[in-house]
Amino acid sequence: LTEVLGTQIEAGAKAERAVLISDLHVGTDGGAVLRSLDAALAVARDSADALFVLGDLFDSYVCRAQIRVGIWREVAARFRVATDGGLRIVVLVGNRDFLLGPEFVAATGAELVTGGYRVQLGGVDTLLVHGDELCQNDLPYQKAKRWLRHPLTRLVARSMPVALARRAAEKARKKSQNVIQSGDQSRFLPSERAVATAFAVGVERLIFGHIHRHARGSFERGSYHVLPAFDQDGVGLRIDPGGWQPVRFGKGAAAATEVELPEACAWSK
């Protein structure tokens, strides 16, 4: 394993053709994002080797018992149908669902990555991360992240009853929203130094989500793609040996339609 910005990076099996999505934020009521998810699963089953979810599949996930109830069970069932049909699904944890654990793997048949993932996608050496580790200037979040992911904190949280876990998640979300609305907004952007550190492991391409801003460009001798929040417009990324193309899933008659290439990302200093 390699560590980048406190994130353990796993090496994964290559995929010549892949679908990538991020930040679905599936809430307790499901919502329209499920239609886009179903379309992405269908496209991946028909034309890809793997589906990659780059974090925040769920709006919140705290305790292991959640996978047996409500929307968490519904999404798990969708994934199980796909994996039983032969689709490889790789799910990275995000800042909202970092407490996903073995119960998720058992229910879905997916691979769970608790850090980053280095993989050959379409023949290109690629690093996949959620993206929160790149936002190093968001000091309050980075400090909270360290104790939230401490083994003791994880043990207590994952053992909670579902009702208590949901109340705790709602309280934390409200507090987070208040923090986000105050102060210098540039601190929520990836820092140039952090992005350079990610590329320093030797990859040719970096793909991440988290900041909910669709972007794409070059960085030094590599290239990057920032996935937008999937729950906002159903946009993800298709990769094959011929290149990479952003697409919108589940809108209109077609399962996937191409969208315009986004502009470059802004970095914080």
Residue map of PLM features:
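Structural motif
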Residues: R17-A18, D49-A50, V124-T126, R205, ...
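N-terminal short leaders/motifs
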Residues: D59-A82, R173-V203
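Active-site-proximal loop/helix segment associated with metal-binding centers of metalloenzymes
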Residues: G131-P190
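A short, surface-exposed interaction/processing loop segment used at functional sites
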Residues: R248-V259
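A short, charged
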Residues: E258-K269
